[in-house]
């Protein structure tokens, strides 16, 4: 974290952290340079988390982009909001690096969430790998889309906890056959597109079985068997988890 004590020659001791940023935004370039220098270990860590450890990251294009992004974060940071600057700047750096990596490695990106997008697979018991292999892919990959999906899966874990589910539950209950997967995704889509059904789902923390069976002629046994998987898909489709959502819509042909 930044050492405010090192700014005593540049500012009054009573100046707050926000006041430092305010002065930088007002044009104090000496303070800006000192501020960025003190944050370089943090910036370097952000780069390392996304692209993996490389020799001399400080000489990399990714690090240069991260420095520019950090400077951008200073300029765009809203002093009146409660968002912490460190969290805000990390998100700006992440977005800029992801944009860069997508543009330079778009032809080499390993597809996360391939479980939903594997159109060439028969999805039988022998050919379908476990949930972690299909959903979480190689944790050491340095591709931007992997990183973004990893972050989204962490957020998904928090969402499904509210429905008394865990990622381990999804490992066990994920359907093995493509037809079943498509059926579950379509059921999830029905729920999110019908406000009354979604409200029931959200309030009860479970699927609206009666309404789905009566209105859409769906088999209750199938719904119950795949409840956790369908629930997770509803939560993704109703969220801002854009990478995971994209693969669902790709599978549905949208």
UniProtKB/Swiss-Prot annotation:
Primary residence: cytoplasm
Name of the protein this chain belongs to: RNA polymerase sigma factor SigI8
Job description of the protein: Sigma factors are initiation factors that promote the attachment of RNA polymerase to specific initiation sites and are then released.
Ways its activity is controlled: Negatively regulated by the anti-sigma-I factor RsgI8.
Keywords noted in UniProt: Cytoplasm, DNA-binding, Sigma factor, Transcription, Transcription regulation
Gene for this chain: sigI8
A GO cellular component entry from the record: cytoplasm
A single MF term (Gene Ontology): sigma factor activity
DNA-binding region: 209-228
Compartment list: Cytoplasm
Quaternary structure and interacting proteins, as annotated: Interacts with RsgI8.
Chain positions of motif Polymerase core binding: 61-74
Source organism, top-level taxon: Bacteria
Parts forming coiled coils: none
Ligase found in the keyword field: no
Family statement: Belongs to the sigma-70 factor family. SigI subfamily.
Biological process terms in GO annotation: DNA-templated transcription initiation
């Amino acid at each position: 974290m930044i050492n405010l004590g090192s700014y005593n020659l540049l500012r009054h001791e009573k100046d707050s952290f926000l006041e430092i940023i305010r002065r930088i935004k007002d044009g104090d370039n000496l303070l800006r340079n000192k501020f960025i220098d003190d944050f370089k270990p943090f910036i370097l860590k952000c780069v390392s988390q996304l692209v993996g450890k490389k020799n001399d990251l400080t000489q990399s294009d990714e690090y240069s982009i991260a420095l520019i992004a950090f400077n951008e974060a200073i300029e765009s940071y809203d002093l009146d909001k409660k968002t912490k600057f460190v969290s805000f700047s990390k998100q700006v750096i992440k977005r800029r690096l992801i944009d860069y990596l997508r543009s330079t490695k778009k032809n080499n990106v390993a597809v996360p969430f391939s479980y939903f997008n594997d159109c060439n697979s028969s999805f039988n018991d022998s050919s379908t790998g476990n949930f972690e292999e299909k959903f979480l892919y190689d944790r050491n990959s340095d591709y931007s889309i992997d990183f973004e999906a990893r972050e989204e899966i962490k957020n998904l874990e928090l969402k499904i906890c509210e429905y008394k589910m865990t990622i381990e539950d999804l490992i066990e209950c994920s359907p093995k056959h493509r037809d079943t997967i498509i059926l579950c995704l379509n059921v999830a889509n029905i729920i999110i597109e019908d406000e009354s059904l979604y409200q029931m789902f959200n309030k009860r923390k479970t699927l609206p079985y009666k309404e789905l069976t009566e209105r859409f002629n769906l088999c209750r046994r199938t719904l119950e068997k795949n409840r956790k998987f369908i629930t997770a898909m509803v939560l993704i489709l109703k969220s801002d988890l854009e990478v995971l959502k994209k693969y669902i819509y790709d599978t549905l042909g949208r």
